[in-house]
A protein has these predicted regions:
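Internal intein/HINT superfamily modules and their associated LAGLIDADG
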Residues: 1-191
Length: 191
Protein backbone atom coordinates (compact mmCIF):
# COMPACT_ATOMS: atom_id res chain seq x y z
CA UNK A 1 0.00 0.00 0.00
CA UNK A 2 1.23 3.52 -0.60
CA UNK A 3 -0.50 6.60 0.65
CA UNK A 4 -0.03 10.12 1.94
CA UNK A 5 -2.77 9.68 4.57
CA UNK A 6 -1.15 8.99 7.97
CA UNK A 7 -4.38 7.60 9.48
CA UNK A 8 -4.77 5.13 6.62
CA UNK A 9 -1.15 3.99 7.02
CA UNK A 10 -1.64 3.57 10.78
CA UNK A 11 -4.83 1.56 10.21
CA UNK A 12 -3.12 -0.71 7.67
CA UNK A 13 -0.14 -1.24 10.00
CA UNK A 14 -2.44 -2.09 12.91
CA UNK A 15 -4.38 -4.66 10.85
CA UNK A 16 -1.23 -6.39 9.53
CA UNK A 17 0.39 -6.56 12.96
CA UNK A 18 -2.68 -8.35 14.39
CA UNK A 19 -1.47 -11.42 12.51
CA UNK A 20 1.10 -13.23 14.71
CA UNK A 21 4.58 -13.23 13.23
CA UNK A 22 3.85 -10.23 10.98
CA UNK A 23 5.22 -6.71 11.01
CA UNK A 24 5.36 -3.80 8.57
CA UNK A 25 8.15 -1.85 6.93
CA UNK A 26 7.64 1.78 5.90
CA UNK A 27 9.55 3.63 3.16
CA UNK A 28 9.31 7.22 2.00
CA UNK A 29 8.97 7.44 -1.77
CA UNK A 30 10.29 10.19 -4.07
CA UNK A 31 6.74 11.56 -4.40
CA UNK A 32 6.56 12.14 -0.64
CA UNK A 33 4.06 9.31 -0.17
CA UNK A 34 4.84 6.45 2.18
CA UNK A 35 4.97 2.80 1.17
CA UNK A 36 4.00 0.30 3.86
CA UNK A 37 4.86 -3.34 3.25
CA UNK A 38 3.73 -6.43 5.18
CA UNK A 39 6.50 -8.86 6.07
CA UNK A 40 7.16 -11.73 8.44
CA UNK A 41 9.19 -11.35 11.60
CA UNK A 42 12.45 -13.29 11.09
CA UNK A 43 12.63 -16.72 12.65
CA UNK A 44 9.03 -16.78 13.84
CA UNK A 45 7.13 -17.56 10.68
CA UNK A 46 6.43 -21.32 10.78
CA UNK A 47 7.00 -21.75 14.55
CA UNK A 48 4.09 -19.44 15.42
CA UNK A 49 1.61 -21.65 13.57
CA UNK A 50 2.73 -25.18 14.52
CA UNK A 51 4.59 -25.61 11.25
CA UNK A 52 1.77 -24.10 9.16
CA UNK A 53 2.15 -20.96 7.08
CA UNK A 54 0.86 -17.58 8.21
CA UNK A 55 -2.95 -17.12 7.99
CA UNK A 56 -2.54 -13.72 6.24
CA UNK A 57 -0.62 -15.35 3.38
CA UNK A 58 -3.13 -18.20 3.25
CA UNK A 59 -5.98 -15.72 2.68
CA UNK A 60 -4.02 -13.89 -0.01
CA UNK A 61 -3.20 -17.20 -1.75
CA UNK A 62 -6.77 -18.52 -1.39
CA UNK A 63 -8.15 -15.63 -3.42
CA UNK A 64 -5.43 -15.77 -6.07
CA UNK A 65 -3.85 -12.48 -5.02
CA UNK A 66 -0.39 -13.77 -4.13
CA UNK A 67 2.52 -12.23 -6.03
CA UNK A 68 0.30 -10.19 -8.39
CA UNK A 69 1.79 -7.27 -10.28
CA UNK A 70 -0.21 -4.05 -10.65
CA UNK A 71 -1.35 -4.87 -14.20
CA UNK A 72 -2.47 -8.41 -13.14
CA UNK A 73 -4.78 -7.34 -10.32
CA UNK A 74 -8.48 -8.22 -10.27
CA UNK A 75 -11.31 -8.74 -7.81
CA UNK A 76 -11.82 -12.42 -6.89
CA UNK A 77 -15.05 -13.74 -8.42
CA UNK A 78 -16.52 -14.76 -5.05
CA UNK A 79 -16.41 -11.10 -3.90
CA UNK A 80 -19.14 -10.16 -6.39
CA UNK A 81 -21.69 -12.12 -4.35
CA UNK A 82 -20.82 -10.40 -1.05
CA UNK A 83 -23.62 -8.56 0.77
CA UNK A 84 -24.01 -4.90 -0.23
CA UNK A 85 -22.49 -3.60 3.03
CA UNK A 86 -19.31 -5.61 2.40
CA UNK A 87 -19.19 -4.34 -1.20
CA UNK A 88 -19.26 -0.80 0.22
CA UNK A 89 -16.38 -1.62 2.59
CA UNK A 90 -14.36 -3.08 -0.30
CA UNK A 91 -15.04 -0.05 -2.53
CA UNK A 92 -14.09 2.27 0.35
CA UNK A 93 -10.76 0.49 0.81
CA UNK A 94 -10.06 0.61 -2.93
CA UNK A 95 -10.91 4.35 -3.11
CA UNK A 96 -8.75 5.05 -0.04
CA UNK A 97 -5.72 3.66 -1.85
CA UNK A 98 -6.08 4.45 -5.58
CA UNK A 99 -9.27 6.47 -5.90
CA UNK A 100 -9.70 10.21 -6.29
CA UNK A 101 -12.37 12.85 -5.79
CA UNK A 102 -12.13 15.89 -8.04
CA UNK A 103 -14.13 19.06 -8.27
CA UNK A 104 -14.84 20.33 -11.79
CA UNK A 105 -14.48 24.07 -12.33
CA UNK A 106 -17.75 25.27 -13.76
CA UNK A 107 -18.69 28.64 -15.22
CA UNK A 108 -21.76 28.76 -12.94
CA UNK A 109 -19.45 28.97 -9.93
CA UNK A 110 -20.52 25.51 -8.77
CA UNK A 111 -17.80 22.90 -8.52
CA UNK A 112 -19.54 19.53 -8.83
CA UNK A 113 -17.46 16.54 -7.72
CA UNK A 114 -16.66 13.47 -9.74
CA UNK A 115 -14.99 10.30 -8.56
CA UNK A 116 -12.36 8.27 -10.35
CA UNK A 117 -10.45 5.05 -9.74
CA UNK A 118 -7.32 4.52 -11.82
CA UNK A 119 -5.14 1.45 -12.40
CA UNK A 120 -2.93 -0.13 -15.04
CA UNK A 121 -5.14 -3.23 -14.71
CA UNK A 122 -8.07 -3.08 -17.11
CA UNK A 123 -9.58 -6.14 -15.43
CA UNK A 124 -9.48 -4.50 -11.99
CA UNK A 125 -11.11 -1.31 -13.28
CA UNK A 126 -13.86 -3.28 -15.03
CA UNK A 127 -14.34 -5.32 -11.84
CA UNK A 128 -14.79 -2.10 -9.87
CA UNK A 129 -17.31 -0.89 -12.45
CA UNK A 130 -19.19 -4.15 -11.85
CA UNK A 131 -19.08 -3.67 -8.06
CA UNK A 132 -20.40 -0.12 -8.47
CA UNK A 133 -23.43 -1.51 -10.30
CA UNK A 134 -24.12 -3.72 -7.26
CA UNK A 135 -24.70 -0.55 -5.21
CA UNK A 136 -26.66 1.21 -7.95
CA UNK A 137 -23.86 3.39 -9.34
CA UNK A 138 -22.99 3.63 -13.03
CA UNK A 139 -19.36 4.30 -13.87
CA UNK A 140 -17.73 4.90 -17.25
CA UNK A 141 -14.46 3.11 -18.17
CA UNK A 142 -11.87 4.92 -20.27
CA UNK A 143 -8.18 4.44 -21.01
CA UNK A 144 -5.25 6.73 -21.60
CA UNK A 145 -1.70 6.12 -22.78
CA UNK A 146 0.85 7.36 -20.27
CA UNK A 147 4.44 8.48 -20.66
CA UNK A 148 7.32 9.34 -18.38
CA UNK A 149 10.79 10.83 -18.65
CA UNK A 150 13.80 8.74 -17.70
CA UNK A 151 17.25 10.39 -17.77
CA UNK A 152 15.93 13.11 -20.06
CA UNK A 153 14.33 10.67 -22.51
CA UNK A 154 10.55 10.55 -22.90
CA UNK A 155 9.27 6.97 -22.79
CA UNK A 156 5.91 5.33 -23.32
CA UNK A 157 4.28 4.02 -20.16
CA UNK A 158 1.53 1.51 -19.55
CA UNK A 159 -2.07 2.23 -20.44
CA UNK A 160 -3.95 3.72 -17.49
CA UNK A 161 -7.53 2.51 -17.04
CA UNK A 162 -10.10 4.61 -15.21
CA UNK A 163 -13.64 4.18 -14.01
CA UNK A 164 -15.27 7.58 -13.54
CA UNK A 165 -18.52 8.49 -11.80
CA UNK A 166 -19.69 11.93 -12.87
CA UNK A 167 -23.49 12.04 -12.83
CA UNK A 168 -24.72 14.02 -9.79
CA UNK A 169 -27.13 11.23 -8.80
CA UNK A 170 -24.43 8.53 -8.92
CA UNK A 171 -21.78 10.74 -7.29
CA UNK A 172 -24.14 11.37 -4.37
CA UNK A 173 -24.99 7.67 -4.09
CA UNK A 174 -21.32 6.64 -4.16
CA UNK A 175 -20.17 9.31 -1.70
CA UNK A 176 -22.95 8.21 0.67
CA UNK A 177 -21.75 4.59 0.38
CA UNK A 178 -18.01 5.20 0.80
CA UNK A 179 -16.32 5.47 4.17
CA UNK A 180 -13.17 7.41 3.23
CA UNK A 181 -10.11 8.25 5.31
CA UNK A 182 -7.38 10.89 5.27
CA UNK A 183 -7.16 13.56 2.59
CA UNK A 184 -9.90 11.96 0.47
CA UNK A 185 -12.39 12.40 3.32
CA UNK A 186 -11.28 16.01 3.83
CA UNK A 187 -11.84 16.75 0.11
CA UNK A 188 -15.30 15.18 0.26
CA UNK A 189 -16.29 17.40 3.20
CA UNK A 190 -14.87 20.57 1.61
CA UNK A 191 -16.54 19.87 -1.74
Amino acid sequence: IDSQAPDLLARYTELIEKFPGMTTRTETMKSGAYGVYAQKISGRFKDEFNGQSNPLFEVVKKYGLWNKKAFDKSIPESFFSLPEEQIKILLSALWDTDGSIYFKKHSSGKNPPFLEYCSVSEELVRDIQRLLLRIGVVGRVTSKKTSYTYKGEKREGKTAWRVTVGSAEYVHRLLSALSLHGHREERRIKG
